[in-house]
Amino acid sequence: ISPLLALADSVTGALEGGADIHVTAGELSGTAHASLDNVTIRKDETRIEGVSGRIDLARLMPPLTRGTQTLSARRIIAGTELLAPTLTYRIEASPDGPLPRLAIEAARVGIAGGSVSLLPTHIDANRDDHDIDLDLDGVDLKTLMDLIAVEGVSAEGQLSGRLPIHISRDKVFV
């Protein structure tokens, strides 16, 4: 499925898939699919628990998905606990170049007593800059400040609203 799984300390759960691969005149083509059911990946102190969903590639090179797909997990532990992350997406051809783009229709995660959602957007491998909008709902500021642990910074209350973010190759602007 991914060479990155070889870097994990452990992978458990049900994972099955298949591929139809063709090589013609040195060009790789074909399709592939994978189903994940309650897959947990561990690496050191980081865990992604309960990943479920189906990945269905209509084309391997460059990769394109067969329609919209959803992946979900029970939780992610990476310095903090992220609850019930979900991602609804497709990988599609880009109008900006030969590499595909990730079209995110919905993404959501529970954090700091609230939730953060990514509004629909495109992440294009052909572009250096991306603008995304996060929708924050009931995120506890004290918990959030404890997570990021910036010395001398504290806050109380809840954070809700839209947060625009601009990402360039080497900078992030909020």
Question: Locations of the language-model features?
Answer:
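Mature extracytoplasmic or organellar-lumen-exposed domains after removal of signal/transit peptides
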Residues: S168-V172
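Extended amphipathic, helix-rich lipid-handling scaffolds
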Residues: I1-R42, G53-I167
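Extended intrinsically disordered, low-complexity coil regions enriched in Ser, Thr, Gly, Ala
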Residues: R47-E49
